[in-house]
Amino acid sequence: MIPFSLKNGTLCVEDIPLPEIAAQYGTPCYVYSHSYLTERARRFTKALDGAGKGKSLVAFAVKANPSQAILASFAKEGLGADVVSAGEIRRAVHAGIPPERIVFSGVGKTAEEMRYALEIGIGQFNIESVSEIEMLAEVATSLGKKAAVALRINPDVDPHTHAKIATGKADTKFGIAAEDALSAYEKLASYPSLKIQGIASHIGSQITDLAPFEAAAERIYEIITALEKAGHAIETADLGGGLGVRYKDDQPEPPSVEAYGEMIKRVTKGWNCRLIFEPGRSLIANAGVLLSKVIRIKESKTARFVILDAAMNDLVRPTLYDAYHEIKAVTPSAQTYQADIVGPVCETGDIFARNRSISAVKADDLMAIMSAGAYGATMASAYNSRPLVAEVMVSGNKSALIRKRQSVEDLMRDEQKVEWL
């Protein structure tokens, strides 16, 4: 489905015109299409049906968007959760995702986080170093529990994506080098409190070519074969996530979920293990927009600035990654002009688009920053003492506030008065 479309000259989310959302909930706010995200979950699950041994686990990467409403929607679709902190575990469980469908990744798990994960019975730890093996063994022993473990292997595959979101090359902090895999598994097998359950890999995010995924999977299977010859049974293979989405209207469509699924089935044919996947962006990015109002138009000798009430603290991707987002007038006109689209934060880097051709908006017009469902609200901050914005979910002609707008009082609530100041 198409979650955002023009109807009678106005951009709508499903069946609701975005001006109605702005009038009811204010701006800026994030707006999500429930129908789209559930459709994506179903397509992903269906595309991977029959891959590997038994039913694959699709574990949503919670870091992409940890909203309780979104996690609850995915829980109802049978998805699990890929998490990287105890906080994300708590969010997933609170939203209804069973602990056994949770995979705990990340290079910096603390003993306290491991303890909590063991106590609630998560499905798998993806361990990324020998020292982490040692820590988990100690924690599991202290609790009298046995931890199910996969080692994350770094396959040294170039995913051809932005350097800051490439995770499968040898020079990144992630995973254990492929040449060290066998010795790491021998170390893992030496601890009675740890169970060898599987192997894991994740090469990056926003990948728009299937070849790196295929190369990584083939490398992982080579290691699985070597491990099995050494007497280590591998029950699960976590192939990570990273499938990209289209951010620019004039870009070619990236590989579909179905094409990805066909490639996975072909490459993993004959694998005697259950497969796990960690999609994030590909499920949620195009389900959301950041809805904003034009504060004013500023003209200078060198540029025209469209100043929005949204800022880099609300959506940091353009500042952090030079990421491109389509930015559309909610009620577009035939007239266009070139402009820099910026926010009110006191940073030159507070810019969403530079020298962009857009509908000739004016003060109080609404604009939608598209494809903002992933790594948007989750990466927001209160910089310049700007409260976090509201989040809204839409299904058909129904809408609901899923996170209220913060107030400045909310920002100051946890601060403490110091008597001697």
From Swiss-Prot:
SUPFAM superfamilies documented for this protein: Alanine racemase C-terminal domain-like, PLP-binding barrel
Any Pfam family hit: Orn_Arg_deC_N
A biological process from GO: lysine biosynthetic process via diaminopimelate
Catalytic activity: meso-2,6-diaminopimelate + H(+) = L-lysine + CO2
Annotated pathway: Amino-acid biosynthesis; L-lysine biosynthesis via DAP pathway; L-lysine from DL-2,6-diaminopimelate: step 1/1
Record PTM N6-(pyridoxal phosphate)lysine, positions in chain: K63
Cofactor: pyridoxal 5'-phosphate
Family: Belongs to the Orn/Lys/Arg decarboxylase class-II family. LysA subfamily.
Descriptive protein name: Diaminopimelate decarboxylase
Originating organism: Zymomonas mobilis subsp. mobilis (strain ATCC 31821 / ZM4 / CP4)
